[in-house]
């Protein structure tokens, strides 16, 4: 059905037979269907799939023109054409810790736990590419999930020098030097990969990187090393085609202000100074106050929580995993966004405040219905539609064919 809709909407105009088009869509994963049903054919599919009659109303689509009408009432964000693919979620916090520590599967190949920092960086970027190719929003990863592999690298170097008969002091000195060099190489690899690879959305992954010392106690020193290197490399910038250093678009940086780094006499004050220097030159990182966030994000246990925003800059709501009874943020996502055009509501009210709120309530209800349609579409999917998300750790580890609802 979807293939015929897409074919009738656009493919036919390009002199491709239905049989030829169907033969292209041999793999019914979300990624493959996504690329075959993108605008404008996917738009026709959306109108067939948005079953409730009120969602056929062109007022719902301010971002796209339906029936030649676009009055800007509300917006089915980000792209309505993605709605035709029922398993595509929007933004997420990738559970990089689980995927690196317990392994994952990509393209049918088992990727086991890495044993060096630079290897972990390479695998992380491949995970980011796979995940962002199976979604349509922004993603965030935490550098705390990479920190344990810095220690793994240090231990390997230390063991090498010890086996060569060096003293403890020499082993520590040379192992630290080698580890620092590997951290620099790993961060450079990460940055180059993120900026040079293209996902199935036809763009570099819309990625944010979280720098939160409070996420780990055991590997805080290693995390500080990674944060320092990320900031130094961002200050330097990337060379463009003319060899001039410029500000790279991605990854975005998220720096958390906490007791360990906000006072001049605190241990990690030097990182905050470096972050400020980076902001002055490159307009990143963005800053999150641990103190204020813990006041605003209180979970069901009564505990304040601090965690990064998703790539889209929106924050998940506090949540307690019913199985572990612990807060859960990584491996969560949002299902999609619908936006009210407040300017249009104001203009439509004719300066009548009561009419403004009446129109506002109507538009808000329409947005809620649109969100419910997104939820219902997603709830029908199985884990097979995006294995990297649902089967191999980015969101969950469900069996094949299991419902994601």
Which residues are covered by each model-predicted region?
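A domain-level signal for the structural core that forms small-molecule/cofactor-binding pockets
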Residues: 4
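Conserved catalytic cores of very large enzyme subunits
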Residues: 7-405
């Amino acid at each position: 059905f979807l293939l015929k809709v897409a074919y009738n909407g656009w493919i036919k105009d390009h002199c491709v037979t239905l049989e030829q088009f169907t033969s292209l869509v041999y793999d019914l994963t979300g990624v493959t269907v996504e690329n075959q049903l993108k605008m404008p054919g996917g738009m026709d599919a959306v109108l067939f799939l948005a079953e409730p009659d009120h969602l056929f109303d062109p007022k719902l689509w301010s971002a796209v023109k339906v029936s030649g009408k676009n009055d800007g009432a509300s917006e089915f964000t980000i792209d309505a054409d993605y709605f035709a693919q029922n398993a595509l979620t929007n933004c997420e916090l990738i559970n990089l810790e689980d995927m690196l520590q317990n392994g994952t599967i990509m393209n049918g190949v088992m990727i086991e736990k890495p044993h060096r920092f630079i290897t972990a960086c390479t695998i992380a970027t491949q995970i980011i590419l796979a995940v962002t190719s199976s979604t349509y929003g922004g993603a965030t990863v935490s550098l705390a999930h990479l920190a344990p592999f810095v220690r793994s690298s240090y231990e390997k170097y230390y063991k090498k020098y010890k086996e060569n008969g060096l003293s403890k002091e020499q082993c520590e000195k040379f192992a630290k030097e080698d580890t620092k060099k590997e951290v620099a190489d790993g961060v450079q690899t990460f940055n180059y990969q993120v900026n040079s690879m293209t996902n199935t959305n036809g763009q570099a992954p819309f990625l944010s990187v979280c720098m939160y010392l409070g996420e780990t106690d055991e590997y805080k020193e290693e995390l500080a090393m990674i944060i320092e290197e990320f900031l130094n490399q961002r200050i330097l910038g990337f060379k463009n085609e003319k060899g001039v250093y410029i500000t790279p678009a991605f990854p975005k940086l998220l720096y958390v202000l906490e007791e360990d780094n906000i006072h001049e006499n605190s241990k990690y004050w030097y990182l905050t100074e470096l972050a400020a220097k980076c902001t002055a030159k490159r307009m990143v990182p963005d800053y999150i106050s641990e103190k204020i966030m813990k006041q605003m994000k209180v979970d069901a246990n009564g505990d304040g929580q601090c965690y990064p925003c998703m790539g889209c800059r929106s924050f998940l709501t506090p949540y307690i995993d019913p199985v572990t009874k612990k807060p859960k943020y990584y491996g969560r996502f949002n299902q999609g966004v619908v936006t009210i055009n407040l300017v249009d509501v104001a203009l439509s009210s004719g300066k009548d405040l009561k009419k403004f709120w009446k129109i506002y309530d109507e538009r808000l209800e329409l947005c809620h219905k649109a969100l419910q349609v997104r939820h219902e579409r997603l709830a029908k999917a199985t884990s097979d539609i995006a294995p990297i998300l649902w089967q191999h750790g980015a969101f969950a580890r469900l069996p094949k064919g299991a419902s994601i609802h």
